[in-house]
């Protein structure tokens, strides 16, 4: 597998609609305001977080069960900033909608700006032929409330191209998160 460059990412976004909306350069400021960067980087794409969040609360449940998840465990928040309570987490989604090619696996890594503040971003790989908004998981590992900024960079996508297409893609197997929009909760 080879990692794909900024040139390839731009071409795939333009010709195949791989990333929409797409920002062709790295954005670090808006007017005089400094931002957490987003857009194309040398070997990846820095995604933005939309302004829709689900913040975890333990009011309705004593146990977190991925097979029987209680939607009431989240409080919906919409805004330019989301505050995650200490030692808690929140879900969000990318501004960008992705369409992953059949011969590509996409890996997501958190941005150092957040990691150095104790905020961890987790996303499972975007599999071949998966498409949708990416659900982002933010963990606040600190003992203080933590801020997440909407419409700014939160994670970087790395695109790995295989030397041959897979036999069965995510789309072929009817993956449960195919075509997801908005913040998507766990499914079994």
From Swiss-Prot:
Protein name from the UniProt record: dCTP deaminase
MF terms in GO: dCTP deaminase activity; nucleotide binding
Record-linked InterPro entries: dCTP_deaminase, dUTPase-like_sf, dUTPase_trimeric
Any GO BP: dUTP biosynthetic process
Xref: CDD domains: trimeric_dUTPase (cd07557)
Function: Catalyzes the deamination of dCTP to dUTP.
Subunit structure: Homotrimer.
Organism this protein belongs to: Azotobacter vinelandii (strain DJ / ATCC BAA-1303)
Pfam families for this protein: DCD
Pathway(s) of this molecule: Pyrimidine metabolism; dUMP biosynthesis; dUMP from dCTP (dUTP route): step 1/2
Active site per UniProt: 137
Matching Gene3D superfamilies: 2.70.40.10
EC code(s) of this entry: 3.5.4.13
Catalytic activity field: dCTP + H2O + H(+) = dUTP + NH4(+)
Family: Belongs to the dCTP deaminase family.
Keyword Transmembrane assigned: no
Keyword entries, A-Z: Hydrolase, Nucleotide metabolism, Nucleotide-binding
